Amino acid sequence: MTVHYLNGKDSGLFKPLTISNGKITLEHRVVHAPLTRNRGEPLNHSSTPDHPNRIWIPGDAVVEYYSQRATKGGLIISEGIPPSLESNGMPGVPGLFNSEQAAGWKRVVNAVHAKGGIIFCQLWHAGRATIPQMTGSPAVCPSASVWDSPTECYSHPPVGSTQSVLYASHPPIEMTVEHIKQTIDDYCNAAKTAMDIGFDGVEIHSGNGYLPEQFLSSNINKRDDAYGGTPEKRCQFVFELMEQVAKTIGEQNVAIRLSPFGMFNQARGEQRIETWTHLCEGLKKTLPSLSYVSFIEPRYEQIFGAEEKDKFLKSWGLLDVTLDRFRQIFGSTPFFSAGGWDDQNSWGVVESGKYDALLYGRYFTSNPDLVHRLKEKIPMAPYDRTRFYGPFEDNTFHYTDYPTVDQN
């Protein structure tokens, strides 16, 4: 029998959802995904090759962007915010480790709250996915693991250059235990600042091949101490990080983002099911009151053809790459999904019980009124992929200048 699900305003997407262990009630389940846009303003405007600017703050354009996309009772997850200079992975990304940055993010928070919206701060540590020209220090990693491909380049040329930088030219250093503890402290300090300036919660980015997932990935983490060597030990960093952040700001204010089947930034470790099952079971046991968990859908069609994909998954023993097992582990914890949702494939997902909320990214860039469009079944404006990632001379073009339906 064919099941017909309602769409638009009658969809389950527009039913309330409680997160943060009952502290917050969302009025709808259309969530703004964390989107790096590289539109921050440099703290040092006289950046030179010898003295490059390495710190960015949220300026007027960033405030306007978030304000445009805020809705009453709607959740926005911020772009990835570095908790330290060392953690910064890209130019134009405002961090949260000095007073100027905190003041800028407070303006963003206030703008979202003025619209009745809710905003979480996503903390993001690039780990080995950066270069010394960006941070002023060597990239860090669980192990001194070079990138698999010797031709893999950093995303942006350094200040004063048009030449791409090879990651292989700047191999990461292995983190000492003391360095690991300091990094966790950096996260905790940034999380406390986030709550102090009004963010409604903090999400720890533990996917997409960044530092936490580097610890989880056997092809990157070659340690043989408490932080590596087995699936269980490779989870230890994330366990400690989440527990310490929860102690700092309250468990109900903490969320996590995971990509168990992703391969971004060459996170191509094995024992996927064993590792992420142990991780999720441990998180559910030790932190049962997390605000929510957010998962990135496996989308191998973007990397492989059908035959190549099946061959690859079989080589890993991965015949089932759905998120169902993790949904079952987390039970009543609100479970979010990101990965290609639009105005065609969103309907019936919440009603089926598969996920509690859906994250939208690319279409939010070009549709500041995306929630209204979904609700009223109005077609989406196309996005401009060439303007996803700045910085640009004009940071507002195809960032804050997209009109709403009413403005059209």
What are these regions (language model features)?
Residues 1-408:
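Flavin-dependent oxidoreductase catalytic cores
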